[in-house]
Amino acid sequence: MASRTSRTSGHKRRAKKNIEKGVAHIHSTFNNTIVLITDEAGNAVSWSSAGSLGFKGSRKSTPFAAQLAGEAAAKAAMEQNMHSVAISVKGPGPGRESAIRAVAAAGLEITAISDVTPVPHNGSRPPKQRRA
């Protein structure tokens, strides 16, 4: 008989870091909302998106999905002992406001909010207007 060996999963257990301050990058498009929380040097601490939480199709672009993504990323960052974040928001999507509120409601202190949406200096032609 072959001896049984204990099997562990292929994932390494992430060491708990002690990161006090960070930056929450909220990327909100018309199709999805991605929340990435980094330390001050720009190294990723936690992230979440509406798609990674199981929302598919047009449900990804809802403010509710962005709210859950913000909560999930903030809770994961708080497990690394993060207390305060500066928020940078990029994009025109419907999940901008609700993701900011969710990060604040999860218990992280917000020190600053900045809009870093790229604005073209008359670059490429934009997509045609939607007919709703």
From Swiss-Prot:
Keyword Nucleotide-binding: no
Molecular function terms from GO: rRNA binding; structural constituent of ribosome
Pfam families: Ribosomal_S11
Gene Ontology terms describing biological process: translation
GO cellular component: ribonucleoprotein complex; ribosome
Keywords: Ribonucleoprotein, Ribosomal protein, RNA-binding, rRNA-binding
PANTHER family (alphabetical): 40S RIBOSOMAL PROTEIN S14/30S RIBOSOMAL PROTEIN S11
Homology family: Belongs to the universal ribosomal protein uS11 family.
Descriptive protein name: Small ribosomal subunit protein uS11
Organism: Oenococcus oeni (strain ATCC BAA-331 / PSU-1)
